[in-house]
Amino acid sequence: MAAAAGAEGRRAALEAVAAPERGGGSCVLCCGDLEATALGRCDHPVCYRCSTKMRVLCEQRYCAVCREELRQVVFGKKLPAFALIPIHQLQHEKKYDIYFADGKVFALYRQLLQHECPRCPHLPPFSLFGDLEQHMRKQHELFCCKLCLKHLKIFTYERKWYSRKDLARHRMQGDPDDTSHRGHPLCKFCDERYLDNDELLKHLRRDHYFCHFCDSDGAQDYYSDYAYLREHFREKHFLCEEGRCSTEQFTHAFRTEIDLKAHKTACHSRSRAEARQNRQIDLQFSFAPRHSRRSEGVVSGEDYEEVDRYNRQGRAGRASGRGAQQNRRGSWRYKREEEDREVAAAIRASVAAQQQEETQRVEDREEGSRPKKEEAAARVPEEPRGHRRLPRAQGEGSGSKEASANGPVSQEAFPATGPGPVVALSNTLPPPSPELKEEDFPSLCASTSSCCTAVTPGSVGLALAYPGPPRGKNTFQEEDFPALVSSAPKPSSAPSSLISAWNSGCSKKGNLPTPGSQAVVGGSQPPRKAGKGSRGGRKGGPAPVDEEDSGGLTVQGLRSVPTTVAVSSLLAPATNQSSAKVGKKKKVGSEKPGATSSPLLPPDHTPKPSGAEQVLEAPLSKAEVPVTIVVNGHSEGSALVRSAPKEPPGLPRPLGPLPCPIPQEDFPALGGPCPPRMPPPPGFSTVVLLKGTPPPPPPPPGLVPPISKPPPGFSSLLPSSHSACAPSPTTTTTTTTTTKTPGLAPTPQAYLVPENFRERNLQLIQSIKDFLQSDEACFSKFKSHSGEFRQGMISAAQYYKSCRDLLGESFQKIFSELLALLPDTAKQQELLSAHTDFCSREKPPNSRSKRNKKNVWQTSTQQLGLDCCVCPTCQQVLAHGDVSSHQALHAARDDDFPSLQAIARIIT
């Protein structure tokens, strides 16, 4: 024990001799003078300032030289080795474990931690830094930087105090005397400054978002919230937004498309049932109640349902009788389900076969020689169950089948027009039969005449008598297919057959009711189910009339086209007024065979309107029908308007209901033994040639003449509207394709919307704003003038003048597009007329303009400096780029009434 103590004493003596005296020199950390030394167990001396800053301000107790943890340190001026210092005898700071060698060193330590005012040395030190800060703000208007106060661990005497201006410069740019500090950086998302870039980066990483793909590539892009980061993922990378991934963050973004596909395959793959369920579309629809057709001898689905119910009841009875035996047999339920499936499959097959049979029957009926309008009149009163019944007139009793609304019908109501035989019959209606009768398919070109019968006052109905034998629905006779080029019919028999055909259409299956009774019956009938046989019908709406609404052309329509010989005989000897009247009244009879006709008038009292009155009848009748919206040739109206039969353009409709049938006196013979008058062929609204007048002028320049020689009587007809609609290289005219009385311009039709209508409107508005230099007052004035012109409050000339006043010479640059995008054909014509008048006033008139002054629409738009053309069919002003699409719209609409050349090509 004594030996150990002696060895320890000798080691301490050697260390005391070998260790140099602590004190003097400079600090290895701050390079300052060592007024007082801080020494720890590792014997690495540092100045007391650095040790105090580490242990008191930074709360770090390791050695700044060797990083050894120092639990105790000694402050003194000249210190031996730490092991030789008797620390238990020294003054002690318990909070920080600092020992002081003497009182002077302790005073230096206390002075480092005092809060003294640099401007007021006579004041005692403040106990807290907050008190000093308040004193500096109130007494000296000096402030310290909050960021530096929070992050910089320095003594109070080392703090800098700034005025307001200097503090702002310090935060943004830094101190002029300290080039190492360049200000505190700003976060643009939060509008908050941080001590340095490291602190700003910590904030961005912690409180904002960055792309981990771009960050791994070295890009330093940050986003304020995840919405912007999601948009970045969507644009630059691959983002999954299916199912739960639409609400996930970070994990639903992928670097490559292959990773995205692998993710979708792994996480979003569905089973076949789920995929099939996702492809299904739920449709809410209902069927009208289906009436039984058992009385007509047709096997329907109700028969199968009745058999199925009987089988189920029989199985239930047998099951109650031998319940124990069926309990032992476990497969009876499976057999029952198999039987149910077989019955359901049989029902579906039967219903499909029945629908196919009905469709075939309707198509056969349409392909027969029955006229379209008579087929419509026969379909509308048809009922699904029971016998076929005819509509009754108002005031008719329930016992009578059919009676005249104006009393008994005499022979004068249906006079014969020729010397043909007259057959008078008085009988009741024949019993209905499923076979088609000859009345449903009258021949239009029969050589023999059959007139309507006279009915005695005691008769109950009317029936037609035909000289030919009755035929089945699929039996065709020779008179149903007349020769296309044949000799002219006999003068005496042809008018008789024509009148017989109109009267058979008017009195088919009996006398016709009044318009009021027809409307009542039509409103009381149940709607027919829209099936495959109905063309163009709508679900739950009224039944379609016939194939005419869909624009088709049946065999009967082809046969109703007159031959070239018959048309040429029609065109030659007729007068203007009488032939136009006969053509119109016969078209009314052919288009509406089920409607009543005009009252009885003698031939000398028949009104003969002039050509202008005939043209103006169509707009007057159009104003009374319900308004429909026409977009690119397709009408968007009510179901009642759609269900009405379509009429060819130019056909005036009657202004009101007429109570009496058409008498023969309304169709007088115009030329004695001349051929019969027939309605104009399809594609021609009115064909008029004045007797003794020169033929119409030749086609205007720009229209291509027909390729082949026209048939006799058609030398003055122009080509179809399809070729006339295309602009010519030299000039563009508005000549229509139908032969008209000279001086009559075609009526403007509905506006057909061109392609890219909305985008072009926006471009036009932007061009107007640019020309007005974004002047809102001028633009508002332009819009008000445009609205007044559209509403008819100002004329086209006033509107044209106001636009020129606003836009000046720039108006000429946008006038063509403004005119083409004006959604009103009539307003287009007015505005073009105003432009033509302005150009005629600007330029001196020459001989050519005087020659064309008769019709302003024959003036070329290119001569007026316009980049547009006028459609000769509907009078719509078009840009040159819109001509082809506009022509296609007309071609689609003209399929309902094709030209004679198209019919000839179809027949041959």
Swiss-Prot record:
Molecular function GO terms recorded: ribosome binding; ubiquitin protein ligase activity; zinc ion binding
Annotated GO CC locations: cytosol
Catalyzed reactions per annotation: S-ubiquitinyl-[E2 ubiquitin-conjugating enzyme]-L-cysteine + [acceptor protein]-L-lysine = [E2 ubiquitin-conjugating enzyme]-L-cysteine + N(6)-ubiquitinyl-[acceptor protein]-L-lysine
Residue intervals of every RING-type zinc finger in the record: 27-67
Location of region: Disordered: 292-338, 350-441, 467-557, 569-619, 719-744
Modified residues (Phosphoserine): S295, S433
PTM annotation (Phosphotyrosine): residues: Y304
Enzyme class, UniProt record, top EC level: transferase
Similarity comment: Belongs to the ZNF598/HEL2 family.
Protein name: E3 ubiquitin-protein ligase ZNF598
